[in-house]
């Protein structure tokens, strides 16, 4: 480290050793921002044509995705697999998962703060006007379990 002030962005487990040694510090994370706690910021998307033509494929994908997320948070063996794959300790793998990727943040069935998201889309000029309930229903299609 150069003893200069620098700001960066990182995704754990990168940087955890430096945090532990006191070489760097976390001054804020996305989990600290109230705006992110009140709205969904991660989604899985496809286009309408692909969804229409391959709906069964997407349904199977979502089933597997949900099973994988459940496994990641329920079975300690998942931490060992991740730790071995990344080359870190199981403790660090658990810290990465629990501290930086809370289960609810990767839940594909959880959409929160839709009113705020729609208003932000207009304010930030992603869309000219708020979407109607029918448009939102067409846009957000969560496959059944």
Task: Please report, for each region that a protein language model flagged, where it lies by residue.
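Conserved C-terminal helix/tail region of periplasmic/extracytoplasmic solute-binding proteins
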Residues: 121-145
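Preference for short coil/turn "hinge" residues that link or interrupt alpha-helices
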Residues: 17-20, 44, 99, 120, ...
């Amino acid at each position: 480290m150069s003893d200069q002030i620098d700001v960066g962005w990182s995704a754990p487990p990168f940087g955890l050793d430096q945090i532990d040694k006191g070489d760097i510090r976390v001054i804020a994370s996305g989990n600290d921002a109230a705006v992110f706690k009140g709205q969904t910021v991660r989604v899985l998307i496809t286009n309408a044509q692909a969804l229409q033509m391959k709906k069964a494929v997407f349904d199977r994908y979502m089933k597997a995705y949900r099973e994988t997320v459940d496994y990641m948070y329920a079975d300690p063996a998942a931490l060992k697999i991740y730790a071995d794959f990344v080359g870190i300790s199981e403790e660090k793998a658990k810290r990465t998962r629990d501290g930086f990727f809370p289960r609810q943040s990767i839940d594909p069935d959880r959409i929160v703060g839709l009113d705020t998201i729609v208003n932000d889309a207009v304010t930030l000029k992603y869309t000219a006007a708020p979407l109607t309930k029918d448009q939102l229903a067409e846009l957000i299609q969560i496959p059944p379990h």
